Amino acid sequence: MSFAVSLSLLGLVAIAAPMVASVLVALFPRPYAKWFSVLGAAVSTACTIALAANFAGAGMPDTQVPLISFGQTLVMGFTFDRMSTLLAPAFVGIGLFVVIYSIPYMSENNREHPDAPRRRFYAYLATFIGAMAGLVYSSTLLGQLVFFEITGACSWGLISYYMSPTAKKAGMKALIITHIGALGLYLGAAIVFAHTGTFAITAIAGLDAKLKAIVLLLVLFAAWAKSAQAPMYMWLPSAMEAPTPVSAYLHGASMVKVGVCVFARALVSAGEVPEIVGWVAIIDAMVTMLFGFLMYLPQKDMKRLLAFSTIAQLSYVFFGLGLSVFGSQLAFDGAVCHIFNHAFAKTLFFLIAGSFSFTLGTRMLPKLRGIVKKYPISGVGFGVAALAIAGVPPMNTFFSKFQIIAGGFSVGVGNVAILVLVCIMVAETVATFAWFLKWMGYCLPGEPSEEVAAGAPLPRAMAFVFIVLIIMVIVSGPLSASWIG
């Protein structure tokens, strides 16, 4: 079996296994639903890891594999490179741990949302996991669109899960805004096909400068919608109506990561990129960064604080991708690494918030005191996640933020405007550290508050997931940097 064929088979199974699991969830009685989801996600995770291992063992050669063509028109295909083989195991593996965490969370024992989990929860979540693998591996704009739309449908179903009026409104808001953004990807794909006769993302490189700029800006517009960047951010804070495991996956390794992945793939495939694309990307990133920071300052609900934090954190990625247009490969590498690193840190933080909802019946920060004494694992997880989001060494995001900032300073040597923007980013990261340090000092030490003291025991499945994610937050920074090279 050839190298390309073996990678393709592993990629296909990684996509198909969770989706087959979602069908089995619908066909079998409810008690089996969670186990089919765990099995599908586990098989998918194993395949993405095996694919990455084979890729590394062969010397990491960039590999394009056509899957479906009509005549000379490539419709669907796979791309295996350092970026896709790094991100796919993270997105799928985190999905597996979210499913495991959901088993105790989605139960009558949940103090905030007692619920007998319906099969659709596990069906949507399993489909989401498969779609993320498909999107990361896709080598065509049409393939990206297919999985782009599947993730949108899954997010609608999961955000609306509790079926309250606010949940249904939040789900519809996410669906509408991200579909408005999808128009950019549809138009970009149409332009590429009209001028090249193929949907391959690499065909963007063959367009003239004007058309290339238009296509990349359309892709950027679609990316803003999925990744909740200004002016398309408003769906994400509302999406906190979803069950917390869903919020963790949306923010850490699925919905919001779709946008940055699509834009990064377009940039790396486009050859020489017109500077207007870089300027639009970094200016919007800076506006979003400052807006997100200012908006999470007054938040007392832990999930809403983390939602606005996600908006700001993803602006770092767009800032790094924009800097790459001006010649900084270091900034591009840092942006890709930040997608990877942030996935573990933010998933951990959201799942910690969910554990408070489960055991205490609240996630309001002013009510959370003395966490370390009552829940040592949750307290350590809170601290590790907070330090990671703030970019404190040796946590993973320190390394990726450093790459982006260093790349920005290298570009800023010859461009005062960019240098100023990089300095603003540095100031924002320092302010973020100060704000999260405040909440760490308030919530973690001391005697437990009344709410914390009366809390229920932490389920073992949650503790297991926390331990794995804490380890990954610490080790994934050097891992991603060495993989991207």
What are these regions, as identified by a protein language model?
Residues 39-53, 181-187, 382-390, 468-479:
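Hydrophobic alpha-helical membrane-insertion segments
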Residues 11-30, 224, 228, 289:
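N-terminal signal-anchor/start-transfer transmembrane helix
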Residues 30-42, 170-179, 375-381, 459-467:
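Alpha-helical transmembrane segments and their helix-start/interface "positive-inside/aromatic belt" motifs
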Residues 1-10, 23-123, 198-206, 485:
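Transmembrane helix-loop-helix hairpins at membrane boundaries of multipass inner-membrane proteins
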Residues 12, 32-38, 142-146, 278-279:
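Short, aromatic-rich membrane-interface segments at the entry and exit
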Residues 372-379, 429, 433-485:
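Cytoplasmic/organellar membrane-interface segments at the starts of transmembrane helices
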Residues 97-114, 119, 123-144, 154-445:
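Hydrophobic transmembrane alpha-helices and their helix-loop junctions in integral membrane proteins
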